[in-house]
Amino acid sequence: MESMGLTAVGFVNEAAIDAAVRRVEDLFSPQVVQIQYTLENNHYGDPAITFRILVTDDAAHDIDQLYELSEKISKTLTNEAHTYEIGLDAHFSYRTVSEQKKLPDPMWK
């Protein structure tokens, strides 16, 4: 039986979320460089997960292409991590590699 970790948002199987994130990274490689997440409560105090998706500059070159990619990634992450089934409100933040170089943020490593 896998252990369930108690987090600020309750009982969440972080190993299952980690595995889902790695699957989505692999699925969308090479456009996706890295996906990270944070478990927290949203501004209403409800359990939430915020995904930070780092994409290549090429993936973001065309706004329509980026929109389509972000929609696919968001839906796939939600489905793979079963966020709604486990009671987590999913949020998504996207950044390009060049943006990260200009605006270094430790949350984005």
Give short role names for the model-derived ranges.
Residues M1-G5, V33, G87-H91:
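N-terminal leader/presequence segments that precede the conserved core
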Residues M1-I17:
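N-terminal presequence-like segments and adjacent domain-start helices
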Residues T7, F11, N41, Y67:
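Short, charged/polar micro-motifs that form catalytic or ligand-binding hotspots
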Residues N13-E25, A59-I86:
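Short, non-transmembrane amphipathic alpha-helical segments
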Residues E25-S29, G45-P47, H61, K102:
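Short acidic, gly/pro-rich beta-turn/loop elements at beta-sheet edges
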Residues P30-V55:
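Short edge beta-strands and adjacent turn/loop segments
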Residues H43, D57-A59, S98:
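Residues that cap or initiate secondary-structure elements
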Residues E85-K109:
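Polar/charged, Gly/Pro-rich intrinsically disordered segments
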